């Protein structure tokens, strides 16, 4: 992943000044970010700006899990591939090729970034509501590969809403799922807080069956992320 990491950092260094000008970003709990070693970074997902906001505040290379259909979007597809993006189907299925890429991320001691809500929050399109239910695939990655999880949240302080710039018929032609084609609005951040919580040790979730452990770990991560949204930094 060394080539991808270098490409990611070049893109980040180029984009960061523009992100910083467009959005007032404050980060809290950055002392919880471990400086090295394999890691899974989770975050809530309410805007297509989220990967850029999180990457802006996170000092390490992030290899992002992204919905498979996003790799059909011109420009994004090429950027995602050269910057270490890993495609995953929205139904939770993942190809052998993607599994090998994830294993390489961990073998190199890098960070895997994932949004456990998938695109469900944006499909719901109610930006005043709380987090939706999680998909538990990230918990399987953690348990099977013995990787700790760092929970984080993005809290909007100021945001506006605009129509999705790509018309539904074009989205459909690009092969996007029906529910994505029907999304009406997108959130555009003006001011946000990014909060990082304490690392969650995967070893506490190895004693039961994989299915039981996945649910328990997923529930713990979600509750920690909700606590971050409501905790000491929420009103900072």
Task: Identify the residue ranges that each predicted region occupies.
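Helix-to-loop junction immediately C-terminal to a conserved catalytic motif
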Residues: 8, 13-45
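Short, basic, glycine/proline-bearing loop/turn elements
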Residues: 15, 82-90, 122-126
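Catalytic-site beta-strand/loop segments enriched in glycine and acidic/polar residues
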Residues: 105-139
């Amino acid at each position: 992943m060394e080539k991808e990491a270098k490409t990611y950092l070049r893109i980040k260094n180029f984009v960061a000044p523009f992100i910083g000008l467009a959005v007032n970003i404050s980060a809290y709990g950055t002392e919880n970010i471990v400086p090295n070693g394999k890691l899974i970074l989770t975050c809530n997902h309410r805007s297509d700006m989220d990967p850029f906001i999180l990457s802006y505040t996170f000092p390490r290379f992030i290899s992002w899990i992204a919905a498979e259909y996003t790799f059909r979007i011109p420009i994004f597809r090429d950027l995602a591939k050269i910057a270490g993006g890993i495609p995953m189907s929205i139904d939770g299925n993942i190809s052998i090729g993607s599994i090998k890429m994830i294993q390489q991320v961990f073998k190199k001691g890098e960070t895997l970034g994932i949004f456990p809500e998938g695109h469900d929050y944006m499909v719901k399109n109610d930006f005043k509501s709380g987090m939706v239910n999680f998909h538990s695939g990230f918990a399987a990655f953690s348990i099977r590969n013995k990787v700790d999880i760092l929970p984080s949240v993005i809290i909007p302080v100021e945001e506006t809403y605009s129509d999705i710039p790509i018309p539904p018929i074009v989205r459909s032609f690009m092969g996007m799922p029906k529910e994505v084609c029907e999304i009406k609005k997108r959130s555009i951040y003006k001011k946000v807080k990014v909060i990082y919580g304490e690392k969650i040790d995967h070893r506490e979730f190895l004693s039961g069956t994989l299915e039981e452990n996945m649910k328990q770990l997923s529930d713990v991560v979600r509750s920690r992320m909700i606590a971050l949204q409501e905790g000491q930094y929420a009103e900072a």
